[in-house]
Amino acid sequence: MRISPRLFLSKAERFVPKSGVYPQGFAVGGIHCGIKKPDVLDLAMLQNTSGKDAVAAAVFTQNKFKAAPVQVSAEILEKSGGAINSLIVNSGNANAVTGTKGLEDARSMVAATDEAAKNTKTASLVMSTGVIGNRLPIGNILSGIPVLGQQLGSTHAHWLQCAQAICTTDSFPKMVSKQFSLNGNTYALAGVAKGAGMICPNMATLLGFFATDAPVSRSALQSILAFAVDRSFNSISVDGDMSTNDTIVAIANGAAGGPLIENEDTPAFAALRGEITAFAQQLASLVVRDGEGATKFITIRVVNAKSYADAKCVASTVANSSLFKTAMFGNDANWGRILCAIGYAPVSGSSVDTTRTSVSFVPSEGEPLRLLVNGEPETVDENRALEILQKRGFGGGNRFGHRRKPRGHISDV
């Protein structure tokens, strides 16, 4: 049997790109400002340098204890109408559950970033990640922001520094970039994310931001981001914990030209939404692959559910089942645990027809291994099941009797 050399590569060697394609009119970077131990990057910035007005959209945590930067950024986004020119992000300290002083610190980071970026008509957003309950070393951060502002650039190295500067328990920096064509124009998307623990649907210690030089209105971008996040960052699970700080931001400056995308009923809107959704799914998958203590990357796909909401609910229930995760970790083809989770998923009774439910293990290559077909158990080839389960990545297929599009959910065990 031939063994792939990739089995012996570290996660960083497998998943951190050596080059990329980056959107026009954005400068990024990362430095050490004194939050973490010496020489570890802990402050990142993104700035629109195109000379064109940029717009931003965001999706924030659903946790009731929203961190100070989440509250401040949501407030700024609403007041500015989405006219955002820059982002500032620190790692190593979450500035969460820090009271009024924490809010003051977050606002002072925004003010310092606005000054460094020379923002006048536009504003900055702020994000933080790290330990909860401690005040920021705000003096270090405020001293670092103007220094960082002078070191921004648009190269692959600058984007990598930016990705490194937002990491906490991550074992590798997470970044993705791509080019795509729309209406005869070529555009680029680039983004970074962090997260390895406290990851579950509705996001969790998870920060991410991405930029595009495509021309899109703020309302259209918000609609696209909400759609994309629901099908990416809100469809992943590692440990089922939800954080106080998670934030995903998208910013667009239209620097590559072309007609403005604003009408949701146009092919251009649908095409851009598809590009951003696929991009977000790729970035979110890196978070799952870096899950704390994780050994496998599993995609749970539900087909023919009664509705999109039901499919997502079933997939999420299976993904967060401790018994399912235990079985997968132990390479145990105990598909009864999958069926059990499907059965207690909080969907209406008519959504799951037990006589038309099928379950399969789906390898990345080769034919699916059928475990249950229309409610009837199959004779399972245990050796083939073990071969599939020992892989780093595979899928689980659940088919119901209704005719609907498939729904994917990513879990790590």
Curated annotation (Swiss-Prot):
One of its GO terms (biological process) is L-arginine biosynthetic process. Pathway: Amino-acid biosynthesis; L-arginine biosynthesis; L-ornithine and N-acetyl-L-glutamate from L-glutamate and N(2)-acetyl-L-ornithine (cyclic): step 1/1; Amino-acid biosynthesis; L-arginine biosynthesis; N(2)-acetyl-L-ornithine from L-glutamate: step 1/4. GO terms for molecular function: glutamate N-acetyltransferase activity; L-glutamate N-acetyltransferase activity. Substrate binds at residues 168, 194, 205, 292. Its EC number is 2.3.1.35, 2.3.1.1. Signal peptide: none annotated. The alpha and beta chains are autoproteolytically processed from a single precursor protein within the mitochondrion. Heterodimer of an alpha and a beta chain. This is Arginine biosynthesis bifunctional protein ArgJ, mitochondrial. It comes from Clavispora lusitaniae (strain ATCC 42720).
